[in-house]
Amino acid sequence: MTGERSIFWQPWQGQGMEHLRLTYHEDHVVARGDVQGIAALAPFRLRYKIKCDLGWRTRKLDIELYELHGCRELHVKADGQGNWREEELGPLSELAGCLDVDISATPFTNTLALRRLNLQPGENAALNIAYLKVPELTFHPASQRYSCNWRAPTGAIVTYEDCSAASRPTWRSMPTGW
């Protein structure tokens, strides 16, 4: 399957907006997101690009974070087996075993685990993820649980629980049927 989809999100609380472009290729999927928001009373713009294999495992993550004092970048590769490497720092051993990335500033990254798991009604899964906190741009492993409540032709209703208490905003206009 090839093609492209464009999606917009807005947080329920606070100020912000995200534009996501999801592009399906023959052998991989690319998500490009542009998030604008406010953190600690300061505006920021986060641009990310995530390349996944067809099993929705993160293989490459590129981040650009624009703040009042300039731009910071982060470039990470993953082997799809739970090993992560930052371009300048080398191996990120604290993330060993994490297959999915979750960027705090976007709801999209929860989709990666959902697509990979393909939960059916009544099923749930607990997993460890590589959590990227924005605007700090710091990684740490976190535990999350996903439960599929029911499935409709256009998508599924899924409950997301952050078992490690790393908080994130709640977003509206989340699309279904991917």
What does each model-found stretch correspond to?
Residues M1-G55:
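Short N-terminal edge-element motif at the start of the domain
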Residues T2-H19, Y24, L74-T159:
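Solvent-exposed helix/loop surface patches that form functional interfaces
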Residues G14-Q15, A42-R45, H69, F139-P141, ...:
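Short solvent-exposed loop/turn micro-motifs enriched in small/polar/acidic residues
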Residues T23-H28, K51-T58, A78-Q81, P153-T154, ...:
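Short, solvent-exposed coil/turn segments at beta-strand boundaries
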Residues A31, L46-I50, L61, V158, ...:
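Hydrophobic residues positioned within well-ordered beta-strands of beta-sheet architectures
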Residues D34-G37, E64-E67, E88-L92, E161-A166:
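Secondary-structure transition/turn motif
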Residues A40-E88:
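Hydrophobic/aromatic-rich structural module bridging two neighboring secondary-structure elements via a short loop
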Residues E161-W178:
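C-terminal structured interaction module
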